[in-house]
Structure formats: structure tokens, C-alpha cells
Amino acid sequence: MIASVAGGCVAAAIALAYGASWSVAALCASDLAALVFIAWVWLSVGRADAAATARIARIEDASRVAAESVLLGAGAASLVVVAFTLSQAGAATAPDRGLLTALAVGSVALAWTSVHTVHVLRYARLYYSQPEGGVDFGSQAPDYSDFAYLALTIGMTFQVSDTDLTAKRVRRVALHHALLSYLFGAVILAITVNSVAGLLGQ
């Protein structure tokens, strides 16, 4: 988590040193922080089996929970900066227009991925908190790929499929997750429309 923040600060400083606007610097910072976080998480838990998943998820770390909350807030806040960057792109000429649009698209993709990665960790932690359970994964003990399946299903469809949520604490987090995912979906649609309109206007 500390590496994510440090990387983001370095990216912002470099961008500002090269004369980038505050919005571009902010997106560069959030992009690098998200990239470091995503890589760190999946290198740490990507190959964990069910037993390792349970062991990792049961580790209570208040700083980790706080860092995840900061990442979620930063991901949502970056959407505002993306909107501003797209307005800059609309007024810019080539090749700046294409670069700003590409930065906005990449920023949304990284923020979207980091939000769902945070929820993978949260669902695992909730599942293994007392009383254990809250999600029906069938007869086999879940690993992180199962929690990724749950998080991505909610993130892309705003609902669960064949993994019933049986605990109120999990349903509450799933509701917040679905609402945040809907916000990202709306922004992705807006970026698509903006990009197509820009191409047609050239």
C-alpha cells in the first residue's frame, strides 16, 4: 500500500516537472498507484489455494482496511478528474487530443480494476470473519478466484448469479459495490460517446 502511494507521488511530481496540468498529474499519480496496488495484490494472492486464502483473509490489519478505503475514494474521485481531462481533450488539437483521451480511458480502466480488486479482498475478509460464511460457494472451500468471480459479477452486472449472499454484512457491501460499479459504467459510456463524437468531428 505504501508503495502505491509513493509511486503515485513520484508520478505526479514527474508530470508536473514536465509542465503537465494538475489534472494530468493527478491522473498519472492515481494510475501508477492503482497499477502498483493491482500488481501487488494479485502477485500476493493470485495463486493462493483455499487454505492460504483463509489464512490471508483472517489477518486483521486496520491499516490495510484504511488503505483500501482510501483507494476506493481515490478511484471515485478520479472520475471527476477524468471528466475534466476529457473536456480538455475536446478543446485540444491533435496529437494532444488523442493523448488526453487515451489517458482518460486508461485511468478509468485502472480505477475500475482497482475498485473490484479491493472488493475481492473485502469479500474474502467478510467471508472469514465471525460468524464465518455469508456467501454460498457450494460444497468446496473458496479461494481468491471465487471471490474475484463474485466481485466481477457484481461489478459488471450489478447483481449476483449463482453465489447467494446469505449474510446481511455481505449484502451491504455488495450494495455499495454495485452502486459504485454503476457509476463507473456511466462514466465508461460517457467516454465512449465522447471518443466517438471526437472521431466523427475530425
Predicted feature descriptions by range:
Residues M1-A17, A76:
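The first (N-terminal) embedded transmembrane alpha-helix
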Residues G75-D96, I154-K168:
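Alpha-helical transmembrane segments and their membrane-interface junctions
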